[in-house]
């Protein structure tokens, strides 16, 4: 996504923020742009509290003097604002490219409303992945063998030539979904495996998605919502 588009989405997302809200703050490059904008909003006198989904987000929020709550301290979460990896016409979503899928999913499940930010490339007819699968390191051989027995392409996520390790101390396997017919069922199947903590298929779908079309920010509403979205 171009930096200008990220900035446009961040500015549009700020319009959804109200004084007194508790916000779920996602992880990733698109969300970083929003948190930068939120920092300016707080600096100008806005009052919110955030629940961060990663150590990276905690550090950024602290630098910008955005007040944070732990998950235990948050009585509720009003709105999650985060990025996505893929979304299909039924608003089924893949996330976890930034490596924070488990915490992002917990925060999303606790939130009253979800707003995702996405450029046009994130919209697909079918979810093709890769699907991030967060696993305990000890279970890696077992889970990899299970997936390869299904003729699926599996890649251990790396960072700087070493296995990527999540904030929770786990590994991530990225699974190609080209041969998977039913992603929801497949994600549930994976969750039943010993050693699998979570997958990047999000059962809780967003209420709205902000995207950029022809140089303008557009808000898309979940198919089950009555408001049809529109230009922001």
From Swiss-Prot:
Biological processes per GO annotation: D-ribose metabolic process; pentose-phosphate shunt, non-oxidative branch
Annotated family: Belongs to the ribose 5-phosphate isomerase family.
Xref: Gene3D superfamilies: 3.30.70.260, 3.40.50.1360
Reaction it catalyzes: aldehydo-D-ribose 5-phosphate = D-ribulose 5-phosphate
Pfam families, sorted: Rib_5-P_isom_A (PF06026)
Residues engaged in binding substrate: 27-30, 82-85, 95-98, 122
Subunit structure of this chain's protein: Homodimer.
Molecular function in Gene Ontology: ribose-5-phosphate isomerase activity
EC code: 5.3.1.6
The protein, known as: Ribose-5-phosphate isomerase A
CDD domains tied to this protein: RPI_A
Coiled-coil stretches: none
Domain of life: Bacteria
Database matches in InterPro entries: NagB/RpiA_transferase-like, Ribose5P_isomerase_typA_subgr, Ribose5P_isomerase_type_A
Record keywords: Isomerase
Gene: rpiA
Role played: Catalyzes the reversible conversion of ribose-5-phosphate to ribulose 5-phosphate.
Taxonomy of the source species: Bacteria, Bacillati, Bacillota, Bacilli, Bacillales
Pathway: Carbohydrate degradation; pentose phosphate pathway; D-ribose 5-phosphate from D-ribulose 5-phosphate (non-oxidative stage): step 1/1
């Amino acid at each position: 996504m171009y930096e200008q588009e990220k900035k446009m989405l961040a500015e549009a997302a700020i319009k959804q923020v109200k004084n007194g809200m508790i916000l779920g703050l996602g992880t990733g490059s698109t969300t970083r742009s929003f948190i930068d904008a939120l920092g300016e909003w707080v600096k100008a006198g806005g009052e919110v509290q955030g629940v961060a989904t990663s150590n990276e987000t905690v550090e950024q929020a602290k630098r910008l003097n955005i007040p944070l709550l732990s998950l235990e301290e948050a009585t509720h979460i009003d709105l999650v604002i985060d990025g996505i990896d893929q979304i299909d016409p039924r608003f089924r979503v893949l996330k976890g490219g930034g490596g924070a899928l488990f915490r992002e999913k917990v925060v999303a499940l606790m939130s009253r409303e979800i707003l995702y930010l996405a450029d046009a490339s994130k919209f697909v007819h079918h979810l093709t992945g890769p699907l991030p699968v967060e696993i305990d390191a000890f279970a890696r051989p077992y889970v990899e063998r299970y997936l390869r027995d299904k003729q699926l392409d599996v890649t251990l996520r790396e960072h700087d030539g070493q296995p990527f390790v999540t904030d929770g101390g786990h590994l991530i396997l990225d699974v190609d979904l080209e041969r998977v017919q039913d992603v929801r069922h497949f994600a549930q199947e994976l969750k039943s495996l010993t050693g699998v903590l979570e997958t990047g298929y999000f059962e809780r779908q967003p209420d709205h998605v902000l995207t950029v079309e022809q140089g303008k920010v557009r808000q898309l509403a979940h198919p089950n919502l009555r408001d049809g979205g529109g230009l922001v």
